[in-house]
């Protein structure tokens, strides 16, 4: 049988507060390329991906990544920008 590959246009995941180029590459290696895919991922699943990367990645907190990605996937740019003002390194700050 021939395998059918579906071409997905990747989003710039580093737009997410807390994700830089190395984390974006790690997500891509785990088949997360789009804001929609990231928004559908559970924070625990994302933490598992980070944990596999070792200590340097384990310290990151992906708790808000799906929420941020959902806003971008839905084109809610103003809401996304408001949310990112409340975040530092992807985490909510009081």
Regions found by a protein language model. Name each.
Residues 1-17, 21-94:
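C-terminal extensions
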């Amino acid at each position: 049988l021939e395998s059918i590959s579906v071409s997905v246009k990747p989003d710039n995941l580093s737009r997410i507060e807390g994700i830089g180029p190395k984390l974006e590459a790690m997500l891509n290696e785990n088949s997360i390329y789009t804001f929609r895919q990231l928004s559908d991922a559970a924070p625990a699943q994302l933490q598992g991906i980070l944990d596999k990367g070792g200590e340097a990645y384990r310290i990151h907190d992906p708790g808000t990544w799906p929420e941020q990605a959902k806003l971008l996937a839905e084109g809610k740019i103003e809401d996304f920008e408001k949310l990112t003002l409340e975040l530092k390194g992807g985490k909510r700050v009081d």
